[in-house]
UniProtKB/Swiss-Prot annotation:
The protein's name: Chorismate synthase
Keyword Amino-acid biosynthesis listed: yes
EC code: 4.2.3.5
GO molecular function: chorismate synthase activity; FMN binding
Record text on cofactor binding: Reduced FMN (FMNH(2)).
GN (gene name): aroC
Protein family according to the UniProt entry: Belongs to the chorismate synthase family.
Record's function text: This reaction introduces a second double bond into the aromatic ring system.
Region (Disordered): 42-61
Database matches in CDD domains: Chorismate_synthase
Binding positions for FMN per the UniProt entry: 126-128, 287, 302-306, 328
Annotated source species: Synechococcus sp. (strain JA-2-3B'a(2-13)) (Cyanobacteria bacterium Yellowstone B-Prime)
Length: 378
């Protein structure tokens, strides 16, 4: 865990591989046994994040076909580590020769060199978004566990590209609406404007950033482990570990700071199924614990660092120079970041679901009388 390549407590994932190495992949440890699982379950999610899927993504062509090497037998998980491998087939390390000695502005080149004294400059190595293949593969397993165990649905979409903002109701948006266009924005009018902006940036050799919003529905109450492992804290860490992420907010987020307590509080009311909240400014989490309402969060992604426009930079030996980067890169990471965000949210929720049942769901203590609060004295 100290090396930063593993994530999770009970549902633990470890990713490996580099952008232009032989393969990338993941080992998932802690998956419950007897879960029906096939390569097709994982492939469906990998296809959503693979490169070359549309004119507004990187032109790199990778099939990203997954292989399950262990942990599954006759279509069911064994409860042992699951190893998933994806081979790289369209690597072009020669496109990155200049990066061997020149740092890309706002990229991990300089900081990896400063930390390790060595780096894989071919496509960014571990700093490449290609590392997220392992996350998405593991997220596919987590999604299936959540769906079968609790009916949880996780759905992300592009909410903003640069200054083009979509109008989306997270409580009613559907997967069909998200996947209806190449930018993965469920607002058709905004999607058309976003695509135009991305195409313009690509023609100019530049890039754009924006915001991905994610909703998790039917999350059981009680997930989260205060005080240091609050659910929103782990969600923030998860999505902020994604490449190019620069901001996180949940529920009302920063906008909530403009409200009073009376305006912001989510009032309770009773239904036949128990208590609910009339609003959801808490974003489905109170006190670090899920409250049963939709979990709604947003992640800000910066513009892609590697661009064809000339930029001032320095070399490995300290010389100032100008770099116009080559290689194949997304002019905007957001369309492919959608399944990445979903995967990281799924990993957190699955881990906390298992942790909750381990702590609170295994022992029956109904025979033990609970203390009753004494009535106040008159």
């Amino acid at each position: 865990m100290a090396n930063g390549n593993s994530f999770g407590v009970l549902f633990c994932v470890t990713t490996y591989g580099e952008s232009h190495g032989g393969a990338v992949g993941v080992v998932v440890d802690g998956c419950p046994p007897r879960l029906p699982l096939s390569e097709a379950d994982i492939q469906a999610e990998l296809d959503r994040r693979r490169p070359g899927q549309s004119p507004i993504t990187t032109p790199r062509q990778e099939a990203d076909r997954c292989q399950i090497l262990s942990g599954v037998f006759q279509g069911f998980t064994l409860g042992t580590p699951i190893h998933i491998l994806v081979r790289n087939q369209d690597a072009r390390p020669q496109d990155y020769q200049e990066m061997a000695t020149t740092f890309r502005p706002s990229h991990a080149d300089a900081t990896y060199q400063a930390k390790y004294g060595i780096r894989n400059w071919q496509g960014g190595g571990r700093a490449s978004a290609r590392e997220t293949i392992g996350r998405v593969a593991a997220g596919a397993i987590a999604k299936k566990i959540l769906r079968l165990a609790a009916g949880v649905e996780i759905l992300a979409y592009v909410q903003r590209v640069k200054d083009v903002e979509a109008q989306v109701d997270p409580s009613s948006v559907t997967a069909e609406q998200v996947e209806a266009n190449i930018v993965r924005c469920p607002d058709p009018q905004a999607a058309a404007a976003m695509i135009q902006k991305i195409e313009e940036a690509a023609r100019e050799g530049d890039s754009l950033g924006g915001v991905v919003e994610c909703v998790a529905r039917r999350v059981p109450r009680g997930l989260g482990s205060p005080v240091f492992d609050k659910l929103e804290a782990d969600l923030a860490k998860a999505v902020m570990s994604l490449p190019a992420s620069k901001g996180f907010e949940i529920g009302s987020g920063f906008a909530g700071t403009y409200l009073t307590g009376k305006q912001h509080n989510d009032e309770f009311y009773m239904t036949p199924g128990g208590w609910r909240t009339r609003s959801n400014r808490s974003g489905g989490i109170q006190g670090g614990i899920s409250n049963g309402e939709d979990i709604v969060l947003r992640v800000a992604f910066k513009p892609t660092a590697t661009i064809r426009q000339p930029q001032n930079t320095v070399t490995l030996n300290g010389q100032e120079t100008v770099l116009a980067a080559r290689g194949r890169h997304d002019p905007c990471v957001l369309p492919r970041a959608v399944p990445m965000v979903e995967a990281m949210v799924a990993l957190v929720l699955c881990d906390h679901l298992l942790r909750h049942h381990a702590q609170c769901g295994s022992l029956v203590l109904s025979e033990v009388p609970l203390p009753v609060a004494a009535a106040p004295q008159a």
